[in-house]
UniProtKB/Swiss-Prot annotation:
It comes from the Viruses. Keywords: DNA-binding, Host cell membrane, Host endoplasmic reticulum, Host membrane, Host microsome, Membrane, Phosphoprotein, Transport, Viral movement protein. Belongs to the begomovirus movement protein BC1 family. Phosphorylated. This is Movement protein BC1. One of its GO terms (cellular component) is host cell endoplasmic reticulum membrane. Transports viral genome to neighboring plant cells directly through plasmosdesmata, without any budding. The movement protein allows efficient cell to cell propagation, by bypassing the host cell wall barrier. Begomovirus genome is shuttled out of nucleus by Nuclear shuttle protein (NSP) and the movement protein transports the DNA-NSP complex to cell plasmodesmata and facilitates further movement across the cell wall. Signal peptide: none annotated. One of its GO terms (molecular function) is DNA binding.
């Protein structure tokens, strides 16, 4: 890509002849020179390519067929999302293509804009110089970017009288819907564990004695000096210890009463019952 000075309103590239090809090929554009970029950086300016004009002039016979597809890409995005606009014109249609930018860029990065063309469904021989294209860029430098840039849709100026708006088409990218990203903060339990330190229960202590939870009571306010509406179990230690003692666990109760002799007795009784049942069934069948 060529460099040029930004003193004029538009940066004009040379009018270049392009060969017919079915593969995407770059169109030459003129961008600010390295010196202009340095000056803008020193001034703290950002840059916006406000307007892109592509002047297309055909060089094909009158009975030539096919369509030229011209795409404008922003290389700051991945390949699947980089396309900003697309124009489709008949290969014989002389026209001017206009695209208006909707974003700012910094002078610190390589110019993000890229224009490419290709020809489809044509009877023109591949490799023939079928057209001439000149690119014009209008840049805007400013101290601070506004919050939003007003959208202006692309347009095509048709210069050939043999064609109308029904013979061309163009498309421009729209704003993608944004989905809210939820904060991956700590869970509710994790938040509580950070806010309240876990209580340690010592020997001969119940959980209620060590708990810091309790209801809002006059005596609680007097003793602690603050309301405790969110702490409903803070004063359980005032209850009788018997009311708080759940007793022995199931494993403790079972281990005190169940022995190996009890297990052997259960097995013996079960075997005898099975044998008696089997013998009675055999006798009844013989009778």
């Amino acid at each position: 890509m060529e460099n040029n000075s930004s003193n004029a309103a538009y940066l004009r590239s040379e009018r270049v002849e392009y060969e017919l090809t079915n593969d995407s090929t770059d169109v030459k554009l003129s961008f600010p020179s390295l010196l202009d970029n340095k000056i803008s950086l020193l001034k703290g300016h950002c840059c916006k390519i406000d307007h892109i004009v592509l002047e297309y002039r055909n060089q094909v016979p009158i009975n030539a067929t096919g369509h030229v597809i011209i795409e404008i890409h922003d290389q700051r995005l991945h390949d699947g999302d980089s396309k900003q606009a697309e124009f489709t014109i008949p290969v014989q249609c002389n026209c001017n293509l206009h695209y208006y930018s909707s974003s700012f860029s910094t002078m610190k990065d390589i110019n993000p804009w890229r224009v490419m063309y290709r020809v489809v469904d044509t009877n023109v021989i591949n490799g023939v110089h079928f057209c001439r294209i000149q690119g014009k860029l209008k840049l805007v430098n400013c101290k601070r970017s506004p919050n939003d840039i007003q959208f202006r849709s692309p347009k095509i100026e048709i210069l050939s009288k043999a064609f109308t708006e029904r013979d061309i088409d163009f498309w421009s990218v729209g704003r993608k819907a944004q989905q809210r990203k939820l904060v991956q903060g700590p869970s509710l339990i994790g938040s509580r564990s950070m806010r309240y330190a876990p209580c340690s229960i010592g020997p001969n202590e119940s959980w209620a004695v060590r708990s810091e939870l309790g209801l809002h009571e006059p005596w609680a306010v007097k003793e602690r000096g603050w309301a405790s509406i969110e702490r409903p179990y803070n004063q359980l230690n005032r209850l009788n210890p018997d009311a708080l003692d759940p007793g022995k666990s199931v494993s403790q109760v079972g281990s005190d009463q169940f022995t190996r002799e009890d297990l052997n007795d259960i097995i013996s009784k079960t075997v005898n019952i099975c044998l008696n049942t089997s013998m009675q069934s055999h006798v009844s069948k013989n009778v």
